[in-house]
Amino acid sequence: MYLRFSLMGFKLKEQFYFHLGELIKFNSVNASALKGKPFGEQIDLCLDKVLEIAKDIGFKVYKDRDGYYGFADIGQGDELIGILAHIDIVDAGNVSNWHSNPFKLEFRDGKVYARGVLDDKGPLMAVLYAFKLLALEGIFFKKRFRVIFGTDEETAWRCIEKYKIREEIPDFSFTPDGDFPVVNAEKGLLQFDVISDERFCMNFELGTGYNVIPDECSFELGDSNKDDFRILLDSFGSKIRYKFFESNVLIHGTSAHASLPELGVNVAPYALNIIKSLGVKANFINFFEDKIGFTINGEKLFGRALEDSQSGQLTLCLTKVKLSKTSKQILSFDMRYPVSCQREELVALIKQTLNLYALDYHEVSFLDPLYVDSGSNFIESLIEVYENFTGESDVSPIAIGGATYSRAFKNCVAFGPLFKDSDNTAHKTNEYIDESELMNLISIYKNAIKKLNA
């Protein structure tokens, strides 16, 4: 990696990890609203804690009157530069599959493990400590900087929508929630349900969120022959793992962010294949087998793999399944589509296909694609910081499938935290970040803030 110098003494490093641990301990998954706590108790407590930490560092802090967001200001001047990060996390899933407590920092083999340590609490704390180090150096902030703490990034972005109504929009912004060197293009996001009114013979659920590749499901054995079940599971190959218990079988894949399905092993297609093998007949199963199957690029649904040079190939994943004896059957999908595609045209094609199977389409959420001119002074400044830090040259912005806060404001891009050789463990079981990379983040964000302050 690129660690050029010892950025912090032992005491500051100790403080950094203490403060990061103070955020990690909150299971800040979106939950039922309470008065003044629109996304639940844990997110609200985490927001209070990060504001407390920012205040101790020297920021002037503010919490939205309804609890939707908070921010921390430092500096003066007319221009406002924003840094957007989020304190909410995706569900840790079955914690017994973690090697350590997901809500406590675990240091092992040069890595730091915890839910949110990469996405996005670790990078957020790196930003705050970048400001702390600059303040210790005595730098004068002649521009206004605002670190905005989002609370609903992993679900519906209601926090940022509320912010945009009530607060000043930064002139330029970056979010530490993507990749280096700079992300100036993000695929469009479409999350939707395929719904069937068919009666079904069993209750079955898998998946925790639209943007998480599901890595676990369970089947009750009932009168099924265990040997026959084992033969079927073995026919799937070594990508999945399974374990028999007295009355059920537990099947494991590999979790991943839904924007990067190739990094995971999705148990959902295997589950529907198993259900069909049990003799179950249903239109939604036929649809999935005919138009999705084990593909991740939508080519069976749209007739070809859709892609462009700016942002790459479309991805389409089944991320949740909810089957019921007493209500409707629901298949939930996450789709990331190229910046050159039109969402309305894709939706029309999906609906047209679903009609053939007597299935209904329900749109859950969408985000339009992002594309920011790579020649802007702001992007060039961030590229320069990256090149100076890494020693690389002739670096160009990149595109990703993830949906970051870059789409929230005009002139906003993602800047880290992933380097080109980083392991992307976001949304995975045993999420981690290399300790050296975490220290590198403090360095590079410190340099970027200093450059933007010039």
What are these regions (language model features)?
Residues 12-15, 19-26, 49-57, 133, ...:
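Generic non-transmembrane alpha-helical segments
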